[in-house]
From Swiss-Prot:
Keywords: Acyltransferase, Lipid A biosynthesis, Lipid biosynthesis, Lipid metabolism, Repeat, Transferase. Its EC number is 2.3.1.191. This is UDP-3-O-acylglucosamine N-acyltransferase. Catalyzes the N-acylation of UDP-3-O-acylglucosamine using 3-hydroxyacyl-ACP as the acyl donor. Is involved in the biosynthesis of lipid A, a phosphorylated glycolipid that anchors the lipopolysaccharide to the outer membrane of the cell. It comes from Photobacterium profundum (strain SS9). GO terms for biological process: lipid A biosynthetic process.
């Protein structure tokens, strides 16, 4: 296991070192379980009480929390960001592939960049372009004329359909499907007529796509995922959706077709968003939101009924069903009061 001194960590993170810089760190742990040889972090002052019993060799914390800890410390403006950056330095996650496996099928005219690795039973079809240092896990399918940018990592059993473009330094988790048909049909006297989906999917650079997430290809134009977007597991992105830079989408979210989401948005888990609407930059939608109309102002938006006991919820649901009747009765009372005055 790699070791790094506290002084080296301070230098790489731009942190202020307090204590013995020669102490060696080999891993990161949560504050309550951290032991010798490990570093931990305090991201919120409300957890200061754990500092007194912390057994870690060092703690990343804010200057305001320093008086409450007398051990080795790295002082940072944002300890949680420090944790993220240090985790990257100490990352022990294996490669999704380490060489070109003999069982991989690679079309004769596919272009494979220097240092690329392709796992067992992966399929790289005609015209596909795999960039330098790309990792393609076992059992992946890369369709005709698909392009994967340099440094991207694709875990096992991912399907990337024909003509899809995946940018550089992307991460795609197992079971994701990029470029499958959008849900497009015409109706001919009660019978569904399939509309071939002639667009594709364009994914920018530094994008992360979670396990079992599906991103449909466009009907005519492309579905577009901009640079820096992070998408959690089990999300459905329908055809012709456009997602702006650095937007984050939590698990089980469903987006209908031709939705446009701006930059730097946060979409909570299990949110459902209607198609053919636009959400501006800087919008946060809390978990299980149901978005039926455009959002033109930045801010935090919520919908749904918070958790109650089943007994309370049944009463609330019964009252909700009577809102229209209650509204009519209220207007009638208001009218009578106005007439009497």
């Amino acid at each position: 296991m790699a070791r790094i001194t506290l002084a080296e960590i301070a230098d790489k993170l731009g942190a202020e070192l307090r204590g013995d810089g020669s102490v060696e760190i080999q891993s990161i742990a949560g504050m309550e379980k951290a032991a010798e040889g490990q570093i931990t972090f305090l991201s919120a002052s409300k957890y200061r009480k754990h500092l007194a019993e912390c057994q870690a060799s060092a703690v990343m914390l804010k200057e305001a929390d320093l008086p409450f800890f007398d051990g080795n410390a790295l002082v940072l403006k944002d300890p949680y960001l420090g944790y993220a950056l240090l985790a990257q330095l100490l990352d022990t996650t294996p490669k999704s592939a380490s060489n070109i496996a003999p069982s991989a099928y690679i079309a004769d005219d596919a272009i494979i960049g220097e240092g690329a690795a392709i796992g067992h039973n992966a399929v790289i079809e005609s015209g596909a372009q795999i960039g330098a240092n790309v990792q393609i896990g076992a059992g992946c399918f890369i369709g005709q004329n698909a392009v994967i940018g340099a440094g991207s990592k694709v875990w096992a059993n991912v399907s990337i359909y024909h003509s899809v473009t995946l940018g550089s330094d992307c991460l795609v988790q197992s079971g994701a499907v990029i470029g499958s048909d959008g849900f497009g049909y015409a109706n001919d006297r009660g019978k569904w007529v399939k509309i071939p989906q002639l667009g594709s999917v364009h994914v920018g650079n530094n994008v992360e796509i979670g396990a079992c997430t599906t991103i449909d290809r466009g009907a005519l134009d492309d579905t577009v995922i901009a640079d820096g977007v992070i998408i959690d597991n089990h999300c459905q992105i329908a055809h012709n959706v456009s997602i702006g830079e650095n937007t984050a989408i939590a698990g089980a979210t469903t987006m209908a077709g031709s939705l446009k989401i701006g930059k730097h948005c946060f979409i909570g888990g299990a949110t459902v968003i209607n198609g053919h609407i636009e959400i501006t930059d800087g919008v946060t939608i809390t978990g299980m939101g149901m978005v039926m109309r455009p959002i033109s102002e930045p801010g935090v938006y919520s919908s749904g009924i918070p958790l109650q006991t089943n007994r309370e919820w049944r009463k609330t649901a019964a009252r909700v069903m009577k809102i229209e009747e209650m509204n009519k009765r209220l207007k009638s009372v208001e009218k009578k009061l106005n007439e009497s005055n």
